[in-house]
């Protein structure tokens, strides 16, 4: 769409919408580029046509047509172009009774319609790709949400297990300390009892053995042979 001097957008005339670059399909009515009509009756914008100088300085420039691959002359599309060239872009070609003008415009219409059909197919494909991408994104988003919930549960479970392991370790440490303290206490008490019992036993045993030896020796020394005394059976005769 063209813009007026006041900055307001102005809708282009429908009769000019078919004028386009035969290579990139840029519209003439957008007024963004300079357009040329070549002698081979192809229309191009300044970006899609190669221009070279003529044979002499006063000679017209030579254009390289990218459609028919020929070096031809050309004219810039302006209101000041010759009338027989300007008639090719007449808004009502059916009124001038020129079959070539109608054929020229009809060919450009078909070319631009094919371009629009290609763009519509591309747009349809893009819309389908967008829908597929949206469904895939929604699926991935739901999966990501489920994974976040699962991750949260696993983190809570991990914290619980870590706390449980720490409590078990602390309990085992306390039990080991209590066992060591009990074993040390029992060892000290048993050693004290053994030391207390061992000393009197040694002395008493030696005293008993010495007294036994003395008694046996005294018994041996005191044995004396004497009469055998029969039992006294007293009775009356």
Curated annotation (Swiss-Prot):
Bias-annotated ranges (Polar residues): 221-237
Any one Gene Ontology cellular component term annotated for this protein: recombination nodule
Gene Ontology MF terms in the entry: SUMO transferase activity; zinc ion binding
Tissue: Expressed in nurse cell and pro-oocytes (at protein level).
InterPro entries noted in UniProt: Zip3/RNF212-like, Znf_RING, Znf_RING/FYVE/PHD, Znf_RING_CS
Low complexity composition bias: residue spans: 180-195
SUPFAM superfamilies membership: RING/U-box (SSF57850)
Summary of the knockout phenotype: High levels of X chromosome non-disjunction at the first meiotic division, severe failure to initiate DNA double-strand breaks in oocytes in early pachytene and complete failure of meiotic recombination.
Main location: nucleus
GO BP annotation list: female meiotic nuclear division; homologous chromosome pairing at meiosis; positive regulation of meiotic DNA double-strand break formation; reciprocal meiotic recombination
Zinc finger (RING-type): 21-69
Subunit structure: May interact with itself and with narya and nenya through their RING-type zinc fingers.
Misc. remarks from the entry: The name 'vilya' derives from the fact that this protein contains a RING-type zinc finger and vilya is the mightiest of the three rings of power given by the elves of Eregion in J.R.R. Tolkien's books.
Annotated protein name in UniProt: RING finger protein vilya
Gene from which this protein is expressed: vilya
């Amino acid at each position: 769409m063209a813009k007026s001097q006041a900055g307001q957008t102005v809708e282009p005339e429908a009769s000019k919408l078919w004028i386009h670059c035969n290579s990139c399909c840029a519209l003439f009515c957008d007024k963004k580029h300079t357009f040329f009509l070549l002698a081979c009756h192809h229309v191009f914008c300044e970006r899609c046509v190669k221009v070279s100088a003529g044979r002499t300085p006063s000679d017209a420039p030579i254009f390289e047509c990218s459609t028919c691959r020929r070096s031809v002359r050309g004219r810039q599309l302006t209101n000041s172009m010759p009338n027989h060239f300007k008639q090719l872009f007449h808004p009502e070609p059916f009124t001038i009774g020129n079959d070539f003008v109608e054929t020229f415009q009809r060919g450009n219409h078909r070319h631009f319609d094919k371009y629009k059909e290609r763009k519509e197919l591309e747009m349809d494909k893009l819309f389908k790709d967008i829908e597929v991408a949206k469904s895939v994104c929604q699926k991935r988003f739901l999966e990501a949400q489920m994974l976040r919930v699962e991750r949260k549960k696993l983190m809570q479970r991990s914290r619980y297990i870590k706390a449980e392991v720490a409590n078990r370790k602390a309990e085992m440490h306390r039990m080991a300390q209590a066992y060591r303290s009990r074993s040390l206490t029992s060892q000290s008490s048993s050693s004290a009892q053994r030391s207390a019992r061992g000393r009197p036993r040694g002395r008493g045993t030696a005293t008993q053995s010495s007294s036994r030896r003395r008694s046996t020796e005294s018994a041996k020394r005191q044995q004396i042979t004497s009469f055998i005394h029969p039992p006294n059976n007293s009775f009356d005769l």
